[in-house]
Amino acid sequence: MASPQENCTTLDLIRQHLLDDNVFMEHYCPQPILYSQSSSSSESLNSIASELNNETFSFEPTLKYADTAQSSNLDISSFFNNSKTEFDSFEFETKPNVSAARISSNSPKQTSFKERKPSLNIAIPMKQQEVVQKVEVVPTEKKHYRGVRQRPWGKFAAEIRDPNRKGTRVWLGTFDTAIEAAKAYDRAAFKLRGSKAIVNFPLEVANFKQQDNEILQPANSGRKRMRETENEEIVIKKEVKREERVPAAAAPLTPSSWSAIWEGEDGKGIFEVPPLSPLSPHMAYSQLVMI
């Protein structure tokens, strides 16, 4: 009885001859034939292919197989059916060897699904979109006012030409806004030219008149009060000058003085005679008075 390896080789040769598949030997031949000589695998394949081309097909293997099956008169159809069942019995043993050898030679070592490392689920953070609010800038209309010009640093200067000084410029000041500078120009123009002045805000000329009157009235009233107080002080300080009367010196009693007294009409001259002074060294002489 032939060994299982010999039966397998015969079946493989028959299938190769019938199907004319050159790659069949690399995949379905048992391991001892294909991989016994690992160093000279290419040479063995070439030699097997040349032998198959030179040999003629014979049914000797079929006869051997018929002897084992104890049937001498076996047609080719029964042979293939029996060979198929016989090949299926050996397929379980040969396929794992061929696949294992093929995997080990051609592909890298494969691990089982359980031995694989679990895949990492890395959540990529979403990119935060910054919301930029666009500020709509409303374009403001720049109006040019008469007598106003803007400085490079943003301030507004007001000037006016004085007709009394041959058109020389008069500086009115620097302001934060153009409207304030225009109003300052209107006030100055109204003071210089009156109702003939060309102003930026003609409807506010009446306000300028009221403001000027309010400014002038307190100033005039204050001046009048100052003058009145000065006059009062001057009147108070003026005093009437009174001259002191120096009494006349008492004349000595002489016959002439007595005659003057007696000749008086009132008769009071007698009683107004100065008394005789006891201190006087001379009798009938009054005391001398030093003036």
Swiss-Prot record:
Residue spans binding DNA: 144-202
Signal peptide: none
Keywords: Activator, DNA-binding, Ethylene signaling pathway, Nucleus, Plant defense, Transcription, Transcription regulation
GO molecular function, one term: transcription cis-regulatory region binding
SUPFAM superfamilies in alphabetical order: DNA-binding domain (SSF54171)
Keyword Transcription regulation attributed: yes
Tissue occurrence: Expressed in roots. Not expressed in cell culture.
One GO BP annotation of this record: ethylene-activated signaling pathway
Disulfide bond entries: none
One matching Pfam family: AP2
Localization: Nucleus
Keyword Nucleus annotated: yes
Origin superkingdom: Eukaryota
Induction: Strongly induced by ethephon (ethylene-releasing compound) in buds and in leaves. Also strongly induced by cycloheximide, mechanical stimuli. Wounding leads to a both local and systemic expression, independently of ethylene, and through a de-novo-protein-synthesis-independent regulation. Wound induction is reduced by methyl-jasmonate. Induction by purified xylanase from Trichoderma viride (TvX) and another elicitor from Phytophthora infestans (PiE), that appears to be mediated by a protein kinase cascade, and to be negatively regulated by protein phosphatases.
GO CC annotations on file: nucleus
Family label: Belongs to the ethylene-response factor family. Class 3 subfamily.
Protein function: Acts as a transcriptional activator. Binds to the GCC-box pathogenesis-related promoter element. Involved in the regulation of gene expression by stress factors and by components of stress signal transduction pathways mediated by ethylene, that seems to depend on a protein kinase/phosphatase cascade, and to be influenced by methyl-jasmonate.
Comment, domains: The AP2/ERF domain binds specifically to the 5'-GCCGCC-3' motif. The affinity of this binding is higher if the seventh amino-acid of this domain is basic.
The protein, known as: Ethylene-responsive transcription factor 5
Species name: Nicotiana tabacum (Common tobacco)
